[in-house]
A protein has these predicted regions:
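Bacterial N-terminal signal peptides
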Residues: 13-25
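Exported/periplasmic ABC-transporter solute-binding proteins
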Residues: 27-86, 92-266
Length: 266
C-alpha cells in the first residue's frame, strides 16, 4: 500500500510539473489558432454545362483551391430547379436563362462551333449549303467537292440553349430535318462526329477534340461559331459564401475564363 501511495504521489507531482510547464509556456508563447477544416462542395450541372464545369473544377484544384472534396453531379434541368429551390445544394450550373426567382450569376459566353469529322477535307462551307445539309436536302459530301460519303447530321436536344442558338445564328431560324441523330450532350456530340467520317454537328467550343474540327463559312475567314454562343450561368438558393463563393470568383477571373474557353480561339 505504502509503495502504491508513493507511486501515486510521484505521478501527481509529474502531472503538476507538466501543467506548470504548460502554463508557463502559454504565458510566453501564444497558442496557435486551430486550422479551419477544409470545406466540401457538391455542385450540380446540366448536360449542356457538365463538361464546362468539369474543366472549371480541374482548373480550380490545379490552382490550389482550398477544398477537401469538390464534386460535380450530372442532373436534368428539372432536377436542378427542384434541388436549388429546396436548398438541397449550394450551387448548380445551367446553359439557359435562369429562373428569375433564384440567385444567378453569369459565368461565360461560350462560342458555338460547327464541326465535322477530322478526316473531312473541307475547310469551308457556304451558309446555304449548311442550311441544306441540316434540312436534309443535301445528303452526300461529293456535292460540295469532297470525296463521296453520306452526310450524317447530328443535332442536340431541341430544348437545349446550344441547339436554339445554333438554329438562330447559323440556320436563320430554320428547322433541322427529321433524319438527324440527337446527341444528349456536347461531349456525346464530339464523340459521335469523331466516330463518323461523314458526320457534321455543332457544340460549344470547349468540347472540341482532336477527332473533330470546326468548319468555316466560305469567304468570311472566321469560324461560323462566331455568330452564335451559349451562356453558362451559376444558380444558387441564396448568395454563395465560403468555398462556393471562392469557386465562383475564380471561375469569373481571367484564369478561370482561360480554363473555361480552352480550344475556343478562332
Amino acid at each position: 500500500m505504502t509503495g502504491s501511495r508513493a507511486a501515486r504521489a510521484s505521478w501527481r507531482t509529474l502531472v503538476a510539473a507538466g501543467l506548470a510547464s504548460a502554463i508557463a509556456a502559454g504565458c510566453s508563447t501564444a497558442t496557435p489558432a486551430p486550422t479551419p477544416a477544409a470545406e466540401s462542395l457538391v455542385m450540380l450541372a446540366s448536360a449542356e454545362a457538365y463538361s464546362s464545369v468539369l474543366r472549371l473544377r480541374l482548373g480550380f484544384l490545379e490552382q490550389g483551391g482550398q477544398i477537401e472534396d469538390l464534386q460535380v453531379r450530372l442532373a436534368r434541368a428539372e432536377e436542378i430547379q427542384s434541388a436549388i429551390g429546396a436548398g438541397e445544394f449550394q450551387l448548380a450550373f445551367v446553359v439557359a436563362e435562369p429562373d428569375p426567382h433564384v440567385w444567378a450569376a453569369p459565368i461565360a459566353s461560350v462560342p458555338i462551333r460547327l464541326v465535322a469529322n477530322a478526316a473531312n477535307p473541307l475547310a469551308e462551307i457556304d451558309v446555304e449549303d449548311l442550311r441544306s445539309i441540316f434540312a436534309g436536302n443535301l445528303t452526300d459530301w461529293q456535292e460540295l467537292g469532297a470525296p463521296a460519303h453520306a452526310v450524317r447530321v447530328i443535332s442536340q436536344e431541341p430544348q437545349f440553349e446550344t441547339a436554339r442558338a445554333f438554329r438562330r445564328g447559323m440556320l436563320g431560324g430554320g428547322q433541322i430535318g427529321g433524319g438527324a441523330i440527337v446527341a444528349p450532350s456536347g461531349w456525346a456530340m464530339a464523340q459521335a462526329v469523331g466516330d463518323d467520317p461523314g458526320a457534321i454537328g455543332y457544340l460549344m467550343c470547349n468540347d472540341l477534340t482532336p477527332r473533330i474540327r470546326p468548319l468555316r463559312i466560305a469567304g468570311e475567314g472566321q469560324p461560323l461559331s462566331r455568330e452564335a454562343s451559349a451562356r453558362l450561368f451559376a444558380i444558387a438558393p441564396h448568395p454563395p459564401t465560403g468555398v462556393a463563393l471562392e469557386f465562383l470568383l475564380w471561375a469569373q477571373s481571367p484564369s478561370g475564363q482561360q480554363t473555361m474557353l480552352t480550344n475556343c480561339s478562332p
